[in-house]
Every structure is written in structure tokens, then in C-alpha cells.
Amino acid sequence: MLVFKGKLKEHPRWEVENELYRFRNRVFSDRLGWDVESHRGLEQDSFDTPDTHWVLIEDEEGLCGCIRLLSCAQDYMLPSIFPTALAGEAPPRSSDVWELTRLAIDANRAPRMGNGVSELTCVIFREVYAFARAKGIRELVAVVSLPVERIFRRLGLPIERLGHRQAVDLGAVRGVGIRFHLDERFARAVGHPMQGEYADARELVTE
């Protein structure tokens, strides 16, 4: 499998942008039934800009995993779309705090680890950790459904709920705002050996 982290305009294949929006539409609109902005089979919103950073995973069938990274020094989803998930906390507005959104995987396209979590999830967060270390990011935040929160805990990611820590209504699901601690616990959680092979997409050579 090929792994990419960065801006879409830096990806070696220009087609990946529409592939990403189609993949997101299949996951968030078709499979989960979320109320998202979808047009002609593409799910895209105002946070998708040329400067948005991504982690992407693809195999011979196409994209099978993604996550979006947004700096909290700029407009981001938690205070704009899901303010109740802040649970009474003030929204971070710092360049060393980033938000994770649009996490999606096709779990059937990779092995599962001993804890039952798909390798794709672990690889995505391994790349997120590397990105955060390189950028001097000290903390990550996200809004997640309760099932996704449980997956993160099974993986061993060091997370805590924001504010009053109670689940809130996110529309189609109930969920929480969470904070990730970027410490040695995070590094251990994503440091498991993998059965699959994951190479850097930037090293992809086209004939």
C-alpha cells in the first residue's frame, strides 16, 4: 500500500483529489448517512482548500483510508460546526494545536491487529504522529462518535474528553470532543509491527 501525507497538490497523482471526495461520499453519505455536502458523488466542504493537509492510504483498488488535518489557528470544524462538542471549553486558537477530521477507512482492505483495530487506522495515526512531530504540534483535537472513541481507546491512543465529558448530539450520532496527548503513549500505540507493507506514495515512479 502507498501512504501520503501533505497537501493534495503535492501528491504524485492529480486524480487523487476527486478519488478522495468520492471515497468520502461513499463513507459519510452512502454508508453512514451523515448530512454532508455532496454533489455528483463528491463529498466536499469549505474546509477543503489547497492548503489543507491530509494523510491518505491507497492500494491497487484506490483510496482506502484518509484523515484531514486543520490548524486551530484558522477556521476549523469543532467551534464552527460542532460547538456543543467543546462541552464548555474555549476552542483552541493556537498554531500548535490541530484538528483531525474526515477520518475514513475501508477496514476490509487491510489486516486487523491483535486488538481488533484495522491496520489502516494505526498507519493513519502513525503518519499523523510523524506530521505533528515535524510541525511542532503539541496537541490534537477531534469530534468523534462514541464507537470511534472506543476504537481509539482499543488502539491505546491517549485521549480525554473535552469539558464536561458528556456525550452530545452531533446530528446523525452522539459523540464527544476529544483531545489527543502527543506523548510517548501515542508513540507506543502507533508503533506496533504491521503485517501489511506500506510505502511512501511520493516515491511512486510513473513510467
From Swiss-Prot:
- Species for this entry: Aeromonas salmonicida
Q: Name the Pfam families for this protein.
A: Autoind_synth
Q: Which PROSITE patterns match?
A: AUTOINDUCER_SYNTH_1 (PS00949), AUTOINDUCER_SYNTH_2 (PS51187)
Top EC category: transferase
Q: Which PANTHER family match?
A: ACYL-HOMOSERINE-LACTONE SYNTHASE, ISOVALERYL-HOMOSERINE LACTONE SYNTHASE
Which terms in the Gene Ontology molecular function aspect does this entry carry? N-acyl homoserine lactone synthase activity
* Top-level division of the source organism's lineage: Bacteria
Q: Which family does it belong to?
A: Belongs to the autoinducer synthase family.
The task this protein performs is described as:
Required for the synthesis of N-butanoyl-L-homoserine lactone (BHL), an autoinducer molecule which binds to AsaR.
Q: What is this protein called?
A: Acyl-homoserine-lactone synthase
Q: Which reaction does it catalyse?
A: a fatty acyl-[ACP] + S-adenosyl-L-methionine = an N-acyl-L-homoserine lactone + S-methyl-5'-thioadenosine + holo-[ACP] + H(+)
EC numbers listed for it are: 2.3.1.184
